[in-house]
């Protein structure tokens, strides 16, 4: 079953970058689904952090918020960081708050995506 992405807020160029990053990262992270899933990503000013990922009220759905107030590279890294949290939620596997895995992978994967020429 497909994963559906809904992206709102922000300028059109950030929505395009977010869509490319979501498409690439869900495949790269092995986030596949036998049941339909929806990931809603909102680009909006956040109080004092770059992004967050939370399970939605609907089972199997997730809500991601990303701050536009960062460099493009950091924006991409934050989307990937939050997609790692999606994978952690789906698999039910993480240590502590899951930040260590995100910290180890986010810029490594950001650079991999950057080198691919998709962004």
Over which residues does each language-model region extend?
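Catalytic glutamate of the conserved HExxH
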Residues: 78, 82-86, 90
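Hydrophobic (often cysteine-bearing) scaffold residues that line and stabilize catalytic clefts
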Residues: 14, 18, 76, 80, ...
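Short pre-active-site segment immediately N-terminal to the catalytic Zn-binding motif
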Residues: 62-79, 93-94
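Short strand-loop junctions, especially beta-strand C-caps/beta-turns
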Residues: 8-10, 67-69, 89-91
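Post-HExxH zinc-binding segment in Zn-dependent metallohydrolases
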Residues: 93-119
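Auxiliary, metal-adjacent structural segments of Zn-dependent hydrolase domains
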Residues: 2-58, 62, 111-114, 118-119
């Amino acid at each position: 079953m497909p994963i559906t992405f809904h992206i709102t807020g922000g300028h059109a160029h950030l929505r395009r970058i977010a869509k490319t990053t979501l498409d690439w990262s869900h495949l790269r992270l092995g986030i596949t689904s036998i049941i339909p899933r929806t990931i809603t990503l909102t680009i909006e000013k956040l109080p004092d952090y770059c992004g967050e990922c939370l399970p939605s009220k609907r089972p199997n759905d997730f809500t991601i918020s990303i701050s536009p107030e960062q460099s493009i590279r950091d924006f991409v890294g934050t989307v990937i960081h939050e997609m790692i949290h999606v994978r952690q939620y789906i698999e039910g596997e993480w240590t502590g708050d899951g930040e260590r895995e995100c910290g180890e992978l986010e810029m490594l994967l950001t650079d991999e995506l950057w080198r691919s020429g998709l962004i």
